[in-house]
Design a protein with these regions (language model features):
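Conserved nucleotide-binding/hydrolysis micro-motifs of P-loop NTPases
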Residues: 30, 75, 88, 95-97, ...
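Short, glycine/charged-enriched secondary-structure capping and boundary segments
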Residues: 39-40, 60, 103-106, 141-145, ...
Length: 241
């Protein structure tokens, strides 16, 4: 994975939270021809259909309708780009794993996701949502193997932990970490945490991770910080999709 052309300057958690609130939709693309220019910093969001990617993006940015969650799993086939400022974007990749989607469409999705992950120089890291009630299987394991082989930093979020007790959520996190250990996955490359869009558990921890991935030229840091404004929109307890 090629490095961004920018010198690295860490954002504080507070600055990152403000930056996230400035998110705006840029474009949707079905293939690389429709992507924005490959520059700056991008963080991609992946996960199975109906795991809650859109809800996670909305919670992070404190915008209830920034990312639209489809009521029909497997409906979203496009890659969606959201601009935080002129240098930083969030990227919502199509959900995978929905059984009722035709094989031809599944294969096309896989090609589109792989094309983005393999060839996007701006990609700094991946936020991967997995259901806390499920183990990594099938397509999950294929994606994991591929991310590791491409040396892509990944934060695995155990989502929907609001459906579990605190003890059950911690047990699920332990099982996931044990599974990754047995698969010899480097902990410096793939890290894990619990997350809930309902209780907001894990939002601050995830924001800290994003702060490490969001870096800008030193000479632009103060200017960009001044341009970031707080959105008045507040997140409500939306249904976890």
């Amino acid at each position: 994975m090629a490095k961004t052309q920018f010198d690295e300057v860490s954002w504080s958690q507070t600055s990152t939270a403000k930056l996230l609130r400035s998110a705006q939709f840029v474009t949707s693309a079905a293939n690389p021809k429709g992507y924005p220019e490959d520059k700056g910093i991008e963080v991609g969001f992946v996960g199975r259909s109906n795991v809650g990617k859109s809800t996670c993006l909305n919670a992070l940015t404190q915008q209830r309708r920034l990312a639209h969650a489809s009521k029909t799993p497997g409906r979203t086939q496009l890659i969606n780009f959201f601009q935080l400022n002129e240098h930083v974007k969030l990227v919502d990749l199509p959900g995978y794993g929905y059984a009722k989607v035709p094989i031809a469409i599944k294969e096309q999705w896989a090609k589109n996701i792989e094309a983005y992950l393999a060839k996007r120089d701006a990609l700094r890291g991946i936020v991967w949502l997995v259901d806390a009630r499920r183990e990594l299987v099938g397509e999950d394991l294929l994606l994991l193997e591929w991310l590791v082989s491409q040396n892509i930093e990944t934060r695995l979020l155990l989502s929907k932990t609001d459906k579990l007790s605190r003890n059950q959520a911690q047990q699920a996190l332990h099982r996931l970490n044990k599974q990754l250990e047995l698969l010899n996955v480097p902990t410096k490359l793939v890290s894990t945490q619990v997350y809930s869009s309902v209780s907001k558990e894990g939002i601050e921890v995830l924001t800290q991770r994003l702060a490490l991935w969001f870096s800008v030229p030193t000479e632009l840091e103060d200017d960009l910080s001044n341009k970031v404004t707080q959105s008045p929109t507040e997140i409500e307890n939306d249904e976890v999709l």
